[in-house]
């Protein structure tokens, strides 16, 4: 009898939890039930970006792109955080500055014209100092690095900025998908996830 009572109580608890979960899902999806569809505020760059005319004239060999352009000026300093290996290809840690710091301060400019192609010499849409280092774990050892940026002001305090139409924030990631030769995996799946939930990060090709 004791085991039967315990088993019955267990199933009652499971049933109660299931009912609560169903109610939560119903409440969260109430707008969908009313309208019959979920409103998406997700910006899909590949579908919504305005086509740009080809540049008629600019300096010979000047870099020119229809994508947003981010220029990081480190003043010639190497960005720390690259993976180090020994002669037997064993991981030995990460690179640092001569002073032992694991990040440096640099200057960032973002060229993001809505009508024209972007060039390094264009007037920037956003300028800020940044604290930058190589990001990742095993990806630190890849030939193509990704970077973590913290936007700061002249006092070193957080400097949230809107970049490429995304919500303002002071922390950003430049992801270099070395193993994804299509360059589409993160862009595609972040956007698909963003259609299902608000917590998926925004993403742009640049």
Question: Which residue ranges define each predicted feature?
Answer:
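Short, Lys/Arg-enriched N-terminal segments with co-localized hydrophobic residues
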Residues: 1-8
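Phosphate-handling architecture centered on phosphoinositide signaling
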Residues: 10-206
């Amino acid at each position: 009898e004791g085991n039967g009572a315990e088993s019955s109580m267990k199933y009652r608890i499971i049933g109660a939890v299931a009912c609560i979960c169903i109610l939560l899902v119903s409440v969260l999806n109430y707008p969908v039930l009313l309208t019959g569809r979920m409103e998406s505020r997700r910006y899909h760059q590949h579908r919504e970006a305005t086509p740009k005319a080809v540049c008629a004239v600019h300096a010979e060999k000047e870099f020119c792109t229809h994508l947003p352009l981010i220029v990081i000026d480190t003043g010639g300093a190497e960005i720390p955080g690259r993976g180090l290996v020994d002669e037997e290809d064993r991981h030995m840690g990460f690179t640092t500055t001569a002073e032992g710091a694991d990040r440096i301060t640099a200057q960032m400019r973002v060229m993001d014209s809505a009508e024209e192609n972007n060039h390094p010499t264009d007037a920037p849409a956003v300028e800020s100092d940044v604290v930058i280092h190589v990001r990742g774990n095993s990806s630190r050892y890849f030939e193509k690095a990704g970077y973590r940026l913290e936007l700061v002001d002249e006092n070193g305090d957080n400097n949230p900025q809107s970049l490429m139409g995304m919500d303002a924030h002071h922390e950003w990631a430049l992801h270099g998908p070395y193993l994804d030769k299509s360059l589409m995996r993160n862009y595609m799946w972040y956007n698909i996830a963003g259609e299902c939930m608000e917590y998926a990060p925004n993403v742009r090709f640049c």
